[in-house]
């Protein structure tokens, strides 16, 4: 009986996910599409949890729905009120449909080809057999930060590239109006809890669901809440420290990899005795970089003084000297 109920529940999840995806793509109201996208992200988190993938469920809820939703809602402010998606011509609609069908066929073939080429040994079994030398007891962390650490390094590079593109293209969005004191009071309670939760996710990632991406997104959520409650809080940011935090993740990753290359002749190949400590160091630096990157992405561009803080100070000094000479 319980199995039947779970089957009905899973079937409803799949049908609801397909309905949300279709409605999100077909609606012409941008605000409605963003709201449905956030709801779809939360539903995906539930589905990942049902598939016994808690790390993916946590990442989907925090990043896929939470941070991405905040970014989309912030971007909507750049559009006029009641903006809608323009009607597509039949030719454009047909091209999109053909591309979607072709992509579906290609992905289906890739999955089928991968199953046929498999030797029958599941990846989880291979990871479990090598888990004792990984430095951690969580297989997901072992794969991301040890066995396939190079992939994670490239993911951090992708995040950095995306944020640098945002900083190059735009200045920071204009501050919104002040929020009610009730929301500000709630923020004073929520932000410390989010920071503590971020630290917990970072630490627990070695042996349970969590890790740098989830912790960094949680820390960025705390900064976004502060920005929403106190629109001018970003003016107190130390821009030089923010730049350092933005690159410290990749810098630490590469530094550890080069150190391992000198000692072991292989890039990012940790010795079993040092693997746990090195993974914790890398994850701590990556958490700070991810938090800084997502916070800057939410701001929508360069904060005031980002480009030429030193030049501004020099010009102020020259102005002061000229005024003294005039007097």
Which role does the model predict for each range below?
Residues 1-327:
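Alpha-helical transmembrane segments of multi-pass membrane proteins predominantly involved
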């Amino acid at each position: 009986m319980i199995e039947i109920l779970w089957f009905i529940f899973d079937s409803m999840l799949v049908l609801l996910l397909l309905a949300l995806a279709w409605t999100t793509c077909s609606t012409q109201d941008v605000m409605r599409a963003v709201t449905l996208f956030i709801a779809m992200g939360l539903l995906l988190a539930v589905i990942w949890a049902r598939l016994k993938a808690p790390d993916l469920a946590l990442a989907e809820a925090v990043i896929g729905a939470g941070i991405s939703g905040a970014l989309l809602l912030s971007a909507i402010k750049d559009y006029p009120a009641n903006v809608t998606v323009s009607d597509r011509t039949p030719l454009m609609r047909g091209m999109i449909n053909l591309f979607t069908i072709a992509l579906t066929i290609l992905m289906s073939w890739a999955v089928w080809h991968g199953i046929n080429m498999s030797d029958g040994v599941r990846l989880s079994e291979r990871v479990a057999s090598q888990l004792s030398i990984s430095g951690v007891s969580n297989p997901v962390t072992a794969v991301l930060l040890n066995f396939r650490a190079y992939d994670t390094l490239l993911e951090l590079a992708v995040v950095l590239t995306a944020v640098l593109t945002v900083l190059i293209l735009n200045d920071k969005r204009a501050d919104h109006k002040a929020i009610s004191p009730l929301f500000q009071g709630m923020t004073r309670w929520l932000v410390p809890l989010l920071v503590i939760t971020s630290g917990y996710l970072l630490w627990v990632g070695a042996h349970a669901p969590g890790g740098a991406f989830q912790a960094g997104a949680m820390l960025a959520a705390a900064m976004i809440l502060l920005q929403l409650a106190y629109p001018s809080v970003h003016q107190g940011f130390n821009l030089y420290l923010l730049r350092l935090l933005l690159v410290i993740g990749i810098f630490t990753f590469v530094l550890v990899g080069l150190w391992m290359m000198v000692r072991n002749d292989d890039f990012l190949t940790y010795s079993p005795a040092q693997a746990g400590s090195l993974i914790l160091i890398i994850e701590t630096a990556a958490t700070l970089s991810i938090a800084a990157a997502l916070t800057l992405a939410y701001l929508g561009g360069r904060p005031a003084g980002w480009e030429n803080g030193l030049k501004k100070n020099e010009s102020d000094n020259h102005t002061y000297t000229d005024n003294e000479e005039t007097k």
